[in-house]
Amino acid sequence: NQVFVELIRQGYDTENTLFYYRSRNDKEVDFVTRKGVKVEKLIQVCYDLTSEKTRLREIDALIEVAGELKCQTLQIISYQHKETIEEKGFTIQVIPFMEWVNKPILVTPEIH
């Protein structure tokens, strides 16, 4: 999965900072990123959001897991679709993959 590879390239690792998550009600989120003990963001990957069934599945999973993990940064990485979704007090950014992958990475400088 290209999103997984990009997250690894950005410095996340599967031992400490990058996870898959399943909610208490079996809703799945593709990627949970962490900084220290704090959940940083939730990411769903969905090629096409035009099907209402798919759209609801992706949004419902993000919102449920956001509530469980107390996270406010929610993203859906899509093939081409871009929009901002406001749902149940949460804001979800839908970002085309090529736009997401080309965003600059903010690197915290090392202190010596």
Regions found by a protein language model. Name each.
Residues 1-112:
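A cross-kingdom feature that marks ATP-driven nucleic-acid transaction machinery
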